[in-house]
Amino acid sequence: RTRKMTKKLGARTMPDYFEKRYGSKGMKILAAVIIFVFLVPYSAAVYKGLGSLFGAVFPGVESWVWMLIIACLTALYLVAGGYIATAYTDLIQGIITIVGVVCLVCAVLGHDAVGGVTGLIENLKNFQSVPGDPNPTTGAQLTNMFGGSSFRFLCFNIMLTSFGTWGLPQMIGKFYAIKDTAAIKRGTIISTIFCIVIGCGAYLIGSTSRLVLGGVLPKGGVDSVIPTLLMKILGGGTAGIILLALIMILLLSASMSTLEAVVLTSASSVAVDLIPAVRKKETKPEA
């Protein structure tokens, strides 16, 4: 329905859709401002996560250096190819992400502290929080479907990341590029499979962090849990270094995929919607 309506109205962006659908230029300007203002901290959070990750793996290099490199790479193919570039890179990065998640799940389950699929449940049952654990939890809570002190937060997080994304401007913008009804059916099946594998893999990896790290929060806080987990599992040996490099590419791909969509959407809200609307209003001849 979104694609049909935008094609009928000739809308290119979400603010443009609001103006043509409801005949309100003020709504267009307001939507463009909201999108730009709130997507900036969104992208900042992605940069911070990447900076923490690369800073943990390469402690000799400052985090801001990695942020600058990632920003330049993202800007390079966005400027060169626009939306077509993001579509192709999303496909490639999606394949890298799903391969990386599968490899990481296998590596985590194979760790001595986890002990495979069967050992994971048994070890979690026997888990005891160490003194100073910021979120003390018993083994019974960790293996109970409705247990654990973070159960409510987990449910909220799953709902937010599963259904909240439907209304994100950068996600809705992808609907505008749908070719036909057949593409919708194929895309629904493929994206569902990808989301199930990646989502379940991410939550499974997170659930093993207490076992691998012994319930001790790393020096960098919660943002350093996954980087520390990766270093502890994959830090030694040639195979470990190769797998760690693959995981780094996976995380970089996932983050850059998000960044490119956010940057393209926020930039278009200013360049396509906000600036032309304001200029037209300023240059409008007086009666």
Language-model features: locations:
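Hydrophobic core positions of alpha-helical segments in small-molecule transporters
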Residues: 30, 66-70, 89-92, 187-190
